């Protein structure tokens, strides 16, 4: 949601349809810390805060909830987890996309979907490719004590993961006084600018240049409980309630007490 709101200014002259997947990755029985992270990334906003924002701040000046976005974008906001089925493909195809922008879409899309938009499918990956492919790249970069972390904008040209031609990269310094989630959100500010640059080139009928990824790199999955403990014992944190509170206040113009953030409704 945050990334979409950041992109709205550059997309305002275009017809937009937003398709959502309900999860990213297939792992079940996740460590407790990752379940808590999922609450702060998804349930807190979508199930707890969004209804309150919608009810109390229908005219608020902050970023929009998905319900509010549904009312202002041409194609609305729709859940689409089965994009590779005939029914899902037909729904996707009905939006007649010229460009698909993928940000944490939790389904590996197949060639029939990839071939629809004439400007291709571009994906914003929260890691520097090819070094950090897979999920939670920012976590793994911090786990390895990297001093800089980044995002990669690349094409999706087949069903493989994080292997397409690279359009651009961005990076920021790591602040180990801040949480993993804080860094993910900070990266979206830089990453969405990469998308904006690409969209602007399309608007000007310019070619988006890209290059094949370098050889090497590693593919990462969700961390285990032991790996999360190592991360925490090194002085890092996954989530900071104070940071989340400040984020909501700053971008969604909604004041909420810390006690409300921790009520897993």
List PLM regions with ranges:
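One-carbon transfer enzymes
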Residues: 1-265
């Amino acid at each position: 949601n945050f990334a979409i709101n950041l992109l709205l200014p550059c997309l305002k002259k275009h017809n937009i349809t937003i398709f959502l997947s309900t999860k990213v990755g297939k792992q079940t029985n996740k460590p407790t810390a990752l379940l808590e992270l999922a609450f702060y990334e998804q349930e807190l906003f979508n199930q707890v805060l969004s209804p309150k924002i919608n009810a109390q701040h229908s005219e608020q000046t902050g970023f929009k909830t998905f319900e509010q976005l549904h009312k202002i974008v041409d194609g609305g906001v729709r859940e689409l987890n089965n994009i590779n089925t005939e029914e899902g493909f037909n729904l996707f195809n009905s939006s007649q996309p010229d460009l698909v922008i993928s940000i944490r879409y939790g389904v590996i899309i197949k060639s029939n979907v990839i071939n629809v938009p004439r400007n291709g499918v571009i994906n914003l990956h929260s890691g520097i490719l090819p070094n950090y492919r897979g999920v939670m790249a920012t976590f793994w970069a911090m786990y390895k004590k990297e001093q800089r972390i980044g995002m990669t904008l690349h094409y999706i040209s087949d069903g493989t993961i994080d292997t397409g031609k690279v359009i651009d990269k961005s990076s920021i310094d790591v602040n180990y006084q801040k949480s993993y989630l804080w860094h993910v959100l900070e990266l979206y500010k830089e990453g969405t600018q990469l998308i904006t640059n690409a969209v602007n080139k399309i608007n000007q009928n310019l070619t988006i240049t890209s290059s094949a990824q370098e050889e090497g790199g590693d593919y990462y999955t969700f961390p285990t409980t032991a790996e999360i403990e190592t991360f925490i014992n090194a002085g890092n944190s996954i989530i900071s309630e104070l940071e989340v509170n400040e984020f909501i206040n700053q971008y969604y113009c909604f004041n909420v007490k810390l006690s409300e953030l921790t009520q897993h409704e």
